[in-house]
C-alpha cells in the first residue's frame, strides 16, 4: 500500500521544497499538513515555534495588527480561519500568476527578507553605543514574517493604491 502525501490545502506539496539558507533550515518547518492548524500546542515549550508550519506562522502574523492602540483586537483579532482563507486565496493567485508552488515562493521570500544582523544598545558610563550582533534563526524567521505581514497590511490599506 503506497503512502499518501498530505498536500497543503489539498493542493500544494511541501516535501520537494529545499531551503537554501543553511541557518534557517531548523527554523522553517515544512511538515506535511492539510490545514495548518496547531491549536496552540507550540506555546507549551520555549523554542517549539520552530516546529510550526511556516504557512500557519504567516496566518498568525496576519491576525496581529500592531502594538499601537491595542490593534490585536477588532478586524483580525483571533479570526484564524479568516486569516487562513486569506492566505489560501493569496496562494491560489500566486499559483495562477506564476505557475509555481506558492509555498516555495513564501520560503524564498522569508529567506530573502530575513536579516543577518541587528543592533543592540550597550551603555558604558552613561554613553550609549549601538553594537551589531548576529540574529538567531528563529528571530530571523519571526522578523521576516513580520516584515512580510506589515507590507501586506500597508499595501492593503494604502491610499496611494486607490484610484479615484
Residue ranges and their predicted role:
Residues 51-53, 57-66, 118-159:
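Acidic, compositionally biased tether/linker regions
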Residues 33-104:
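Ribosome large-subunit tunnel/peptidyl-transferase-proximal elements
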Residues 1-56, 125, 129:
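Contiguous, often N-terminal, cationic amphipathic patches that form binding interfaces
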Residues 100-120:
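C-terminal end-helix/capping segment
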Residues 94-99, 108-111, 133, 137, ...:
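Core subunits and conserved enzymes of cellular information-processing
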Residues 162-164:
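Conserved small/polar residues in nucleotide/adenosyl-binding loops
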Amino acid at each position: 500500500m503506497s503512502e499518501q502525501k498530505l498536500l497543503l490545502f489539498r493542493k500544494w506539496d511541501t516535501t520537494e521544497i529545499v531551503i537554501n539558507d543553511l541557518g534557517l533550515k531548523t527554523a522553517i518547518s515544512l511538515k506535511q499538513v492539510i490545514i495548518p492548524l496547531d491549536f496552540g500546542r507550540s506555546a507549551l515549550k520555549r523554542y517549539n515555534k520552530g516546529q510550526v508550519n511556516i504557512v500557519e506562522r504567516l496566518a498568525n502574523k496576519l491576525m496581529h495588527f500592531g502594538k499601537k492602540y491595542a490593534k490585536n483586537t477588532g478586524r483580525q483579532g483571533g479570526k484564524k480561519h479568516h486569516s487562513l482563507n486569506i492566505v489560501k486565496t493569496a496562494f491560489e493567485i500566486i499559483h495562477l500568476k506564476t505557475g509555481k508552488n506558492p509555498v516555495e515562493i513564501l520560503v524564498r521570500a522569508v529567506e530573502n527578507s530575513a536579516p543577518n544582523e541587528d543592533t543592540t544598545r550597550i551603555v558604558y558610563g552613561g554613553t550609549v553605543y549601538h553594537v551589531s550582533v548576529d540574529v538567531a534563526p528563529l528571530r530571523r524567521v519571526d522578523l521576516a514574517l513580520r516584515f512580510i505581514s506589515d507590507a501586506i497590511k500597508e499595501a492593503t490599506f494604502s491610499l496611494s493604491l486607490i484610484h479615484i
